[in-house]
Amino acid sequence: MVNRTPGMGGEYQGPEHRRVQPTGPHVRSIIIVRHGRTAYNEQHRLQGQVDIPLDEVGEWQVRQTARTLRDLYVDGRPDIPKQLVVCSDLGRAVQTAHAFADPLGLDVHPDARVRERSFGAWEGLRLEELERDFTEDYQSWRHFAGGELKHGAEPKGAVGERGVEAIDGWSHRAGPDTTLFVFSHGAWISQTLQTLLGMAQGNHDFGAMTSMFNAHWARLTGADQPDGTVRWRMTEYNHGPAIADTDQWEAPTLH
């Protein structure tokens, strides 16, 4: 297994959102998975909310990840017999979710709140183009100072808020006999986790967590609090199947 630890994100915009945490029964654990590779990933283009499908390598990656997730958290956890599957409504995340869910006969629930951060006018551009044509704003973005906001990007705080709203809602639709699987995107995962875990309060630039690799995941477990809410704690981050730690991950032999 590959289990890499946190370090990258973005700036906070606007007043701190006061989250009203739900109470009552909740899922035992949450596994948040990034989609597999796309042509835009391979070309170093900024995807955002452009609806790009997985490429051939990405389809292979998600099959490896789906198999590992089923081995570890379905077959390997008979004490948690049920699974609830949610995904972004963008195709690359939907494909990744179905690679996991279809062999189990599970429904997949798309949710627009789980879609990737919008990068406005920068979407579809190569990183080298951004660096060349928007040098100052590009460097500001890379150093978590918000240069991308001048070009219509969604504020990171807003991404984190809608992400946590989705997590709060779905995690309370089932009980401790269930694992919630959420299939999403790199920026959404970073900004949602930092908001959910309280990291954004001390790091308003959202720079405390690395970006997740394609077809990798994070795992959260819940601790019940005296007031009836749940505190989510991250036990794994940037975890992938064993083959992800080899050169084959980006260049498998497919034919």
Model-derived features with residue positions:
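Generic structural signal for well-ordered alpha-helical scaffold segments
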Residues: 63-74, 160, 164-172
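Short beta-strand scaffold positions
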Residues: 87-88, 161, 183-184
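Alpha-helix termini
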Residues: 70-80, 172-175, 224-228
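Active-site-proximal alpha-helix that buttresses catalytic centers in soluble enzyme cores
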Residues: 2-15, 22-25, 33-106
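Acidic, low-complexity terminal tails and accessory targeting/binding regions
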Residues: 2-28, 65, 117-129, 176, ...
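Active-site metal-binding loops of divalent metal-dependent hydrolases
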Residues: 36, 186, 238
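Generic beta-sheet signal
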Residues: 30, 83, 178-187
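Phosphate-handling substructures
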Residues: 101-165, 238, 249-255
